């Protein structure tokens, strides 16, 4: 894959920074707000809630930074897709909610699902040379 069209390299860099940067920042929140997030994870029935919050934060930070800088992007995109899919199903189970909570959980579920799509798109091009990237792969 080449980025031959005008502005494609910059657009791809912006996509990496926006998607990866937001998810890495979200991951940092898992570390700074671990207690509150662990309580919510326990409420949702997640085993080992504190460890799960820390682990998911690690996936988000690793995956996000990986995409932004272009280091092992296949692993980073895979980590993000995994986190987003699992958390959509386990944390945003709108089918078990009622009333206003149902709509909020459905919105979060759908955000995670389109995030899975974006992560899979990055995974699909992970084997190509990325512009403005460190270019370290596996």
Regions found by a protein language model. Give the residues of each.
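Extended, low-polarity transmembrane helix blocks
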Residues: 1-36, 48-62, 69-138
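Short amphipathic alpha-helical coupling elements at transmembrane boundaries
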Residues: 39-46
């Amino acid at each position: 894959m080449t980025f031959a069209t005008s502005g494609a390299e910059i657009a791809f860099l912006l996509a990496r920074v926006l998607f990866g940067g937001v998810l890495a920042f979200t991951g940092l929140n898992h570390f700074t707000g671990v207690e509150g997030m662990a309580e919510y994870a326990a409420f949702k029935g997640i085993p080992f809630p504190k460890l799960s919050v820390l682990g998911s934060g690690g996936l988000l930070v690793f995956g996000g930074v990986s995409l932004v800088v272009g280091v092992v992007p296949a692993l980073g995109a895979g980590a993000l897709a995994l986190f987003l899919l699992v958390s959509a199903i386990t944390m945003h189970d709108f089918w078990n909610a009622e009333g206003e909570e149902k709509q909020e959980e459905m919105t979060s579920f759908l955000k995670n699902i389109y995030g899975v799509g974006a992560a899979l798109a990055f995974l699909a091009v992970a084997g190509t040379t990325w512009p403005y990237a460190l270019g370290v792969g596996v």
